[in-house]
């Protein structure tokens, strides 16, 4: 169900001095907030898990980030919480000068990720946005060169698009340097795709969207659309036999690719054992999907036989079993 539709809203705009909301019944509602009078028009908008509206405004001189908690009453602004911030301070107390805000996304943990002309900013506790002592976080990535130094994540990149995949990883599209796949905590760059090392049509990324069931990542560039088959999908809420599927199955002698198991819950602990109960391989699902290269812990291709896939949630309270057949 569409997030806007579930709240009875059709679309949200900034028109002149107000936030204009097109209701599902076709009527317009205008919400007036003094702090956005001089702001440029809204760019990207999202509703987070709390139902709060976040809207970007990208101009350096008059742009920023607007947040609105309308408390479920569109027509009554007297109980609203709202704030438009144009000057951001990081966790070290440093003022981020000449900042332009381009995009925004909420991850699986409710953390807000903001794309700017100076890399990504993170709101680990979005409810503090209305506080006077609010600050954003610039993730520090250690250099791991014995210097003890760290660099801010993608600080020299202009971030045009951010999308969150089923494993809570961040797909970050830049204005001129392709697309990055960043680990869930932001500390590791898993992939960096450019037009030089991948089928990307351009290093200028305009938008990113991810199909929740298949994990396919659709990347809009300045020269057209391209897709990439990711190894993470949206997780299931619970294990169901009808949702769990392994493919290819059986695995035939001429197949050398990965075996995929879908229908997992988030961060499933997965073990593959033979019929004697010996552990062959284990790992953690990426969102709702787990992949295996068909090899044991020593790196050798497994023998002909039936292998059991034992999956359990991260707390060990729920699990499921499926089978994979190998033919050699």
Predicted regions span which residues?
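Blade-level signature of beta-propeller repeat domains, shared across WD40, Kelch, NHL, RCC1
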Residues: 119-121, 204-239
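Single conserved hydrophobic/aromatic residue that forms the stacking wall/gate
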Residues: 2-13
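Short, glycine-anchored, charge-dense loop/turn motifs used at functional sites
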Residues: 269-280, 307
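C-terminal tail/sorting-segment detector
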Residues: 308-328
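Glycine-centered coil/turn sites that cap beta-strands in beta-rich domains
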Residues: 238-271, 289-292
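Short loop/turn segments immediately following beta-strands, especially the blade-tip
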Residues: 24-28, 68-79, 124-136, 183-187, ...
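Glycine-centered tight-turn motifs at strand-turn-strand junctions
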Residues: 279-302, 313-317
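Residue-level detector of Asp-centered blade-edge/turn motifs that repeat once per structural unit
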Residues: 47-50, 106-109, 164-167, 210-214
């Amino acid at each position: 169900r569409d997030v806007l539709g579930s709240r009875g809203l059709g679309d949200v705009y900034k028109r002149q001095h107000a936030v204009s909301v097109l209701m599902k019944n076709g009527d317009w509602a205008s919400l007036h907030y003094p702090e956005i009078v001089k702001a440029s028009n809204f760019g990207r908008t999202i509703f987070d898990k709390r139902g709060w509206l976040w809207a970007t405004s990208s101009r350096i001189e008059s742009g920023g980030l607007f947040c609105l908690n309308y408390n479920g009453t569109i027509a009554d602004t007297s109980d609203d919480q709202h704030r438009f911030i144009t000057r951001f301070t990081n966790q070290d107390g440093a003022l981020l000068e000449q900042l332009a805000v381009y995009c925004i996304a909420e991850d699986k943990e409710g953390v807000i990720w903001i794309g700017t002309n100076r890399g990504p900013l993170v709101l680990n506790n979005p409810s503090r946005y209305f506080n006077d002592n609010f600050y954003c976080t610039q993730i520090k990535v250690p250099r791991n060169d014995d210097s003890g130094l760290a660099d801010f994540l993608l600080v020299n990149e202009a971030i045009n698009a951010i999308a969150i995949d089923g494993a809570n990883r961040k797909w970050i599209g830049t204005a001129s340097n392709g697309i990055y796949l960043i680990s869930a905590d932001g500390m590791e760059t898993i992939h960096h795709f450019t037009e030089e090392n991948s089928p990307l049509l351009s290093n200028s990324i305009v938008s990113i969207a991810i199909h929740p069931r298949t994990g396919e990542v659709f990347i809009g560039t300045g020269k057209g659309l391209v897709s990439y088959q990711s190894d993470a999908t949206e997780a299931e809420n619970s294990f169901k036999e009808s949702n769990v599927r392994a493919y290819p199955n059986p695995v035939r002698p001429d197949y050398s690719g990965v075996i995929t198991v879908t229908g997992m819950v988030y961060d499933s602990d997965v073990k593959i054992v033979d019929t004697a109960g010996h552990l062959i391989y284990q790992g953690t699902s990426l969102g709702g999907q787990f992949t295996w290269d068909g090899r044991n812990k020593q790196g050798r291709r497994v023998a002909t036989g039936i292998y059991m896939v034992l999956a359990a949630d991260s707390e060990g309270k729920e699990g499921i079993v499926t089978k994979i057949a190998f033919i050699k």
